[in-house]
Amino acid sequence: MDVNGHPKFQPSPETDGPLPLTSSTLMVSKSLQQDSLSMVGDRLPPKTGAVVIDMGTGTCKVGFAGQSQPTYTVATILGCQPKKQATKDQSELETFIGEAARSRPELRLVKPIRNGIVVDWEAAELIWRHILEHDLQVATHEHPLLFSDPPFSPATNREKLVEVAFESLHSPALYVASQSVLSVYAHGRVNGLVVDTGHGVSYTVPVVQGYNLPHAIQRLDLAGNHLTAFLAEMLLGSGFSLQQEDLDLVENIKHHYCYLAPDFQKEQARPDEECKQSLKLPDGRTVTLGKELFQCPELLFHPPEIPGLSPIGLPAMAEQSLLKVPQELRPHVARNVILCGGSSLFTGLEGRFRAELLHSLSPEDHVVVMAHPNRNLSVWIGGSILASLHAFQSCWVLREQYEERGPQVVYRKCY
């Protein structure tokens, strides 16, 4: 069912004819287009009580539905220590998240997400609780929660998410939405090919009328944190002294100075001296880097030969995903190729990706690549739009429904 509660068209390879546009599809599409445009401008849809949570490998983004951007974006890192004085009604642990946790060397840091998937539910819950209660300062039992979920997440993770939301956070209502679908909604569309490269994982997913096409998903377990590790290795190899706490400096270099070369072979052939840059770091030190600055993000286009790692990069992944979309549906997807995720923000990436994808496909495919300036927030913005739509309000999984049917209710209401 779509967000209006009507049956949705479910694409299959056997479908003949053009993509059907039902009245409900048109209504949803129009609502999404109107609201997504207003999110970018000065006008906003009415703020609802719902809270949107998009927790990725690198950052957790949280804010109220109807806002144009999350209220809090913090590193997905948790550190805990015993409270010196805790009452009987209080937790015995004092939690620190994000930079507050990093700044305390005495804490053991936990990263609850690996390659986009929650692997430590206790730590994930503590991060959510900390942001909701201490930062947003809301009573969790009063606010519906919309969570994003990777398109390749195990189904059991959704069940666990429902349990945490209702049993631990005591939310009155919940919805779990696919990250790729939310990214499409953020652009006012219901169809598109999402090319997402974030901190822990990269993937391409075709979306048709708000549904992922699972058979066409391409995944690459290489993203921002792997690029940071590569750059750190290059710095160490050049004699630059690095400690574990200096990884933030490496991240800073990566974000501000790394770029995708329009032509890698041509850039690689330039004399080393022409490529060198002297970089002033926030801590006052100076480092000289050269070809590492474009060799680092090049890994997204040409992954290293590592056992178990997909050998194809983002443009080839996008091509393979598109070619797996049924022919009659492909035009609706190809004209909305959406770049998103923090690692898509490298200078030169949009142009290089577009050029390689267009070169590999036929002009008849009419490929259009979209890259919004805030594409690192696409998933959260899509959730903010969806949860604030009037037509969506009947789609929440309510506490009463959970108590009646258990965590499996998520499969009936969240697609």
Curated annotation (Swiss-Prot):
The gene is Actl9. This is Actin-like protein 9. Pfam families: Actin. Testis-specic protein that plays an important role in fusion of proacrosomal vesicles and perinuclear theca formation. Belongs to the actin family. It is found in: Cytoplasmic vesicle, Secretory vesicle, Acrosome; Cytoplasm, Cytoskeleton, Perinuclear theca. It comes from the Eukaryota. Interacts with ACTL7A. Its main location: cytoplasm. One of its GO terms (cellular component) is sperm head.
